[in-house]
Amino acid sequence: LKQETMDFITVCETYFFRELEQLKDVIFYIKSLDRPVNVLCAPCSSGEEVYSLAILASENFVKGMNIVGIDINKKMIDKCNEMIYSERSVSRLNTMQKTRYFDVKDRMYHLKKETLACRCRFDLCNVFDDSLFKFGKFDVIFSRNMMIYFDQDFKIRLMERFYRILNKEGRIYPGKSDLVPETAYFEKNFSAGGVYYSKVD
């Protein structure tokens, strides 16, 4: 498909601190590893989930965390790099968080990159393209509401690809609406923030 078509058909609805308990679960797991950690956010949409993790990492004194966000929608990647968000997008942040992490100009919230404790980068990528493997290995894959668009065969293919890029003891955190297939690659687990899948080695 042409890039213009991809940009039109992909759904990009999100906001900061969406499903906060799951975000906290991710951060607590990363902190427990007590070492540098690589996180993949696929799809990253307009960046709110990546930057939500980055804000929580800063507030919980997590160091050595790197986040890669990928999406097939170029407009969303551009928006991630612009770091400018609406009042609605930041409505779940408290006043102190808005003040600390954003500058407000013309009722738009400009994220202050220097306030984030971790490195965030974004790239145009289709999860079924081999360019996925250029990013190396990850400890956490954060993948919300992507599988809802795939049939069973594509879901299994996706889980196989995620397995290949996850480190030992790596985890996948899906969205609440995702129907994740059972495979030999992952074990389903439950936590306060919902469901996650741990890599079977």
Positions of predicted regions on the chain:
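Short conserved AdoMet
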Residues: 34, 62, 85, 167
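Conserved AdoMet
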Residues: 1-37
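A short glycine-rich, Lys/Arg-flanked "PGG" loop and its adjoining helix->strand segment in the class I
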Residues: 156-168
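Conserved beta-strand signature within the Rossmann-like core of class I S-adenosyl-L-methionine
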Residues: 168-176
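Core SAM-dependent methyltransferase catalytic element
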Residues: 140, 182-201
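Extended basic-aromatic, gly/pro-enriched interface segments that bind polyanionic ligands
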Residues: 65-142, 146-150, 154, 179-180
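Conserved SAM-binding loop of SAM-dependent methyltransferases across substrates and taxa
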Residues: 46-61
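Conserved class I S-adenosyl-L-methionine
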Residues: 36-47, 68
